[in-house]
Amino acid sequence: MRLIDVNSFKLQEFSGSDIPPYAILSHTWGDAEVSFQEWQDLQEASRKAGYSKIYGACQQAKADGLEWLWVDTNCIDKTSSAELSEAINSMFQWYAQSQICYAYLVDVPTGTTNNESDQDALMERFRESRWFTRGWTLQELLAPTSVVFYAYDWTSIGSRETSLSDEIHHATGIDRGYLINDSIMSPLSAGASTKMSWLSKREVTREEDLAYCMLGLFDINMPLLYGEGMKAFTRLQEEIVKSDNDHTIFCWEWIYAITPTNWSSFLAPSPLAFRNSHRFRRRDPNLDETGGLSTYQMTNATL
């Protein structure tokens, strides 16, 4: 992975055990982000709107005693399909292995409040932030050990695992136990239908990313095929079926507005079909008196 030296702003590549402690930035993309190629000329890069949040994240990392930072806009060479595929398949782990994640909310002006009324207004803007509506920020919320939220002016709003867990629950529908580093309620241990219900509330720019942004949460690797549309979401479900005997993957709702009339699959046509599926829980085979869950497999015909 490439990391930014927070002092020189230069990029350096690391791998395996050589990767140093680093901070990581989570944000929503705007119209003038700085690419890997553009970062090679820092004078030109600094003229783009996307530069300021990278600079701010570097300053925050320095304040936190860290020398390295990862940002998805300029640390990945997106002109290389192989590098992009590797990065997307690795991204959950990169967030999980970070020392701290800075969630930057460009649509929350400041985290500074002077009274209770200001605090209430801040929390309302926090819950309504676009950051909570994007597909990619779901794993960025759940993978790191620590997530600290910052407003547009880089004032701190609070952390996921402590002061903001209730607000995040209200904004996302994600149970608080998955937010506070509960040793029992790891996000990876949540049932398939629960994870899909989290996704159903989010949007992406390219519909394939509805599948690709969930690879880490399901601990799945699969090739990226931009241009395949919603077939990517079907492929994701097929990989889940192959790797996990979790029956909640079938707990989806037939919604006529999103389900093709000729749909004959056991798999859902869209994450929206899971919008009410958070209430289902995967069964523990160790507690099943019948001796375990029935198994299933994908064939060249069907499930």
Residue ranges and their predicted role:
Residues 177-303:
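Short helix/strand-capping turn motifs
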